[in-house]
Amino acid sequence: MRRFVLDTSVFTNPDVYLRFDEEPMQAISVFLGLARRADAEFYMPGPVYQELCNLRSMDLIGAEFETEVYIRSPRRFSMTIPSEVLYEFIEEVRTRIQRGLRIAEEHARQAGQAESLPPELITQLRERYREAMRRGILDSREDIDVVLLAYELDATLVSADEGMRKFAERIGIKLVNPRYLRGVMQNLAGDDPGHAPPCGPDQPAG
């Protein structure tokens, strides 16, 4: 039986949930209906599920969600991952810190040439710094939980997050394009894709 580990982006990123339904909560219901029939198991770490509950009102479908999706965090203290991956991660963080410092220095020089610090300069600094430091990298405990659980279970990771997908690929975790999740689930449920209802515009996720 195939296993999938889910990130919140499956239910919060429009490029992904529109494949199930235009309305966010109905999209979750459609997902659960497919999950019930698919020859597969679905998992989500506890902190990630809590994050989803903070973003979506799960009161009416919480019991059904927890029936179809196993809520389970990785066994962090009994896992091993290749040491080279950690060295690569540390090197990438160091590179990003240097990049962030250069951006800060550049904006500091621009600010020094002005009599006062323009608000748009502060906004630009924040945006560029965030882009340099966070894009395409694991930047939260929840992200790490998703990747580690997929690694532990030898499961397929489903996420539109570039950083998670990039790290997962480094350590050999199976991936599925989140835009294709509905089609994959229909195949595992034995549905005829030719008779499936529309599943959203063909836009890239992430």
UniProtKB/Swiss-Prot annotation:
EC number in record: 3.1.26.5
Top class in the EC scheme: hydrolase
Positions of region (Disordered): 187-206
Pfam families: PIN_5
Keyword RNA-binding attached: no
Substrates-to-products reaction catalysed: Endonucleolytic cleavage of RNA, removing 5'-extranucleotides from tRNA precursor
GO molecular function, one term: ribonuclease P activity
Compositionally biased tracts (Pro residues): 195-206
Annotated CDD domains: PIN_VapC-like
Keyword Translocase tagged: no
InterPro entries: PIN-like_dom_sf, RNA_free_RNase_P
Keyword list, A-Z: Endonuclease, Hydrolase, Nuclease, tRNA processing
GO BP: tRNA 5'-leader removal
Function: RNA-free RNase P that catalyzes the removal of the 5'-leader sequence from pre-tRNA to produce the mature 5'-terminus.
Family (UniProt): Belongs to the HARP family.
Name this polypeptide is given: RNA-free ribonuclease P
Taxonomic placement: Bacteria, Pseudomonadati, Pseudomonadota, Gammaproteobacteria, Chromatiales
